[in-house]
Amino acid sequence: MTNXRKTHPLAKIVNNSFIDLPAPSNISAWWNFGSLLGVCLILQILTGLFLAMHYTSDTATAFSSVTHICRDVNYGWIIRYMHANGASMFFICLFMHVGRGLYYGSYVFMETWNIGIVLLFATMATAFMGYV
């Protein structure tokens, strides 16, 4: 009797991608933080775009525009909180990702490590400019 997940055309795609994934056995949960960084970044970009549609940066109306987002925009309060908490989650995932690289000795791959350091500094500079 043949296994349906290995013979059915659609189930075969799912099986090869998720169940019988050709990955080394030493991959742990620490390797998920790179993917979570991508998810957090997409969340930040999308919620930032939706918030920017209603935000005004004028000093006289900035606070009232944030109040408008929270009270008058449909689900504006949750978009604002997702954007604020997504930034914190992004940096938690970022530091866990760097910590995993330090723990497993990824710094020996100099080109990859240096690109990562440049991206880390660029991310920190962008976040600083967002707070200022």
Curated annotation (Swiss-Prot):
Protein name: Cytochrome b
Any single biological process term in GO: mitochondrial electron transport, ubiquinol to cytochrome c
UniProt: heme b b566 binding residues: 97
Organism: Canis simensis
Obligatory cofactor(s): heme b
PANTHER family: CYTOCHROME B
Matching SUPFAM superfamilies: Transmembrane di-heme cytochromes
Residues engaged in binding heme b b562: 83
Principal location class: mitochondrion
Superkingdom as given in the UniProt entry: Eukaryota
Location of the protein in the cell: Mitochondrion inner membrane
Membrane topology type: Multi-pass membrane protein
Membrane-spanning parts: 33-53, 77-98, 113-132
Note: Heme 1 (or BL or b562) is low-potential and absorbs at about 562 nm, and heme 2 (or BH or b566) is high-potential and absorbs at about 566 nm.
Assembly mode: The cytochrome bc1 complex contains 11 subunits: 3 respiratory subunits (MT-CYB, CYC1 and UQCRFS1), 2 core proteins (UQCRC1 and UQCRC2) and 6 low-molecular weight proteins (UQCRH/QCR6, UQCRB/QCR7, UQCRQ/QCR8, UQCR10/QCR9, UQCR11/QCR10 and a cleavage product of UQCRFS1). This cytochrome bc1 complex then forms a dimer.
Gene Ontology terms, MF aspect: metal ion binding; ubiquinol-cytochrome-c reductase activity
Function summary: Component of the ubiquinol-cytochrome c reductase complex (complex III or cytochrome b-c1 complex) that is part of the mitochondrial respiratory chain. The b-c1 complex mediates electron transfer from ubiquinol to cytochrome c. Contributes to the generation of a proton gradient across the mitochondrial membrane that is then used for ATP synthesis.
CDD domains assigned to the protein according to its UniProt record, in alphabetical order: Cytochrome_b_N
